[in-house]
Amino acid sequence: MSEIGERVKKIVVEHLGVEPEKVVDAASFIDDLGADSLDTVELVMAFEEEFGCEIPDDAAETILTVGDAVKFLEKNAKS
């Protein structure tokens, strides 16, 4: 997993309280990791803060899995 992937994984584990082994690229935040809509909003905000970028609402709606988040952040992260 890339450095960005590892940072995403850490945020997901901290915010959702899931086992690190469950945080894989194909894992759906809602279906596999038990997030609700508020959790997903909080994750997006945590990603924005950690990576110094804005995630517009239309982009946030397409970030459904851990892999989606990593791909978006690899393209858009400032740090």
Curated annotation (Swiss-Prot):
It is found in: Cytoplasm. 4'-phosphopantetheine is transferred from CoA to a specific serine of apo-ACP by AcpS. This modification is essential for activity because fatty acids are bound in thioester linkage to the sulfhydryl of the prosthetic group. InterPro entries: ACP (IPR003231), ACP-like_sf (IPR036736), PKS_PP-bd (IPR020806), PP-bd_ACP (IPR009081), Ppantetheine_attach_site (IPR006162). Its main location: cytoplasm. GO terms for cellular component: cytosol; membrane. It comes from the Bacteria. Keywords: Cytoplasm, Fatty acid biosynthesis, Fatty acid metabolism, Lipid biosynthesis, Lipid metabolism, Phosphopantetheine, Phosphoprotein. SMART domains: PKS_PP. One of its GO terms (biological process) is lipid A biosynthetic process. GO terms for molecular function: acyl binding; acyl carrier activity; phosphopantetheine binding. The keyword Cytoplasm applies. Pfam families: PP-binding. Residues 2-77 form the Carrier domain. Pathway: Lipid metabolism; fatty acid biosynthesis. The keyword Chloroplast does not apply. The modification O-(pantetheine 4'-phosphoryl)serine is found at S37. SUPFAM superfamilies: ACP-like (SSF47336). Carrier of the growing fatty acid chain in fatty acid biosynthesis. Belongs to the acyl carrier protein (ACP) family. This is Acyl carrier protein. The gene is acpP.
